Amino acid sequence: EEYKALIHAAHDRGMRVIMDSIHNHIGDQHWWMKDLPTYDWVHNIDEYMQTNYQGSAVADPYASDYDMTKLVDGWFVPEMPDLNQDQPLLTDYLIVNTIWWIEYSGVDGIRMDSYLYPDKEYMAEWVEAVLSSYLDFNIVGEAWAVNPPAAAYWQYDLPGQGDGYDSKLPSITDFPWSFAVRDGMAEEFGWQNGLMKVYYMLGQDHLYADAMKNVIFLDNHDMSRVYEHVGKDKDAFKIAITLLMTQRGIPQVYYGTEFMFGHENRGGDDEAWRQTLPGSWSDDQRTVFEASGRTDEEQEAFEFIRGLANWRKGAIATHEGTMKHFIPENGTYVYF
């Protein structure tokens, strides 16, 4: 009921809500694990096998059956039993469960976590079932892939793909874009380094069915904060934000990035990457939800991002236009 109320309150403010979902695995404390509906409800119930985390193998024309089995059937960690989407009862349950949540809550879209790990034929069936029922709905799959060819495989109707797979998926998380921009701001300019990485990466957009539907981002809960990654260089941070708000795709800002969050270790860890916003809890000493609780640097970053985001709302070219860019020279990258 609280989730439904949140969505309705967001709608009253002209906002939309994206639900985070996952069909790859459950937690080991899920009630299913106390009495599995069928013996084959999860993979490898008798003998633990861990995934290899190599999602790019799905698009690899030379991938071995051994690697594919470990990827799809292996568990993320011992606490996350891997669901078997080849089980027809589970398939039906997951599809109906999704439709129920949309009907009940009025949620506007879904971000599907760990999209590369479940059975890919099931994922295409799930996407088609949802989008054929809700024509103005959107789904973005978390496609953690290291390069554009591996990422583009997961977007709908990729022309010329050798195995003929059509994911039906409208949007993917554009990790190659994120990696290129993060490194582009952190490295010295060179033939293959710095801003050249952004240029080379965008030059592969022809591989995507529609790169404008890619979700682009600078950091997330599984990565070091972008401000930390660029060495806490404020200018580099602002350029990265500018790229986020002016290049093709759907920009996503991870909470805390609007306040230029960093952490002590550059590599960081889950606790550092997922730190709470000051003011989220009653015993916090300050709150960033009000300008009076922010530091000068946090306020500067907030105003910079808010200004660009508000400008982007009315900048039609960033939503519908075409892009033209020039080969970077002497550390300068020009695009329109």
What would you call each of these model-derived segments?
Residues 17-20, 311-322:
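Bilobed periplasmic-binding protein-like "clamshell/Venus-flytrap" ligand-binding domains
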Residues 109, 225-229, 323:
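Surface-exposed cleft-lining segments at the edges of enzyme active sites
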Residues 140-141, 249-257, 316-323:
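Acidic/polar loop patches that form or flank catalytic/metal-binding clefts of enzymes
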Residues 1-105, 123-133, 138, 149-151, ...:
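Substrate-binding/active-site clefts of carbohydrate-active enzymes
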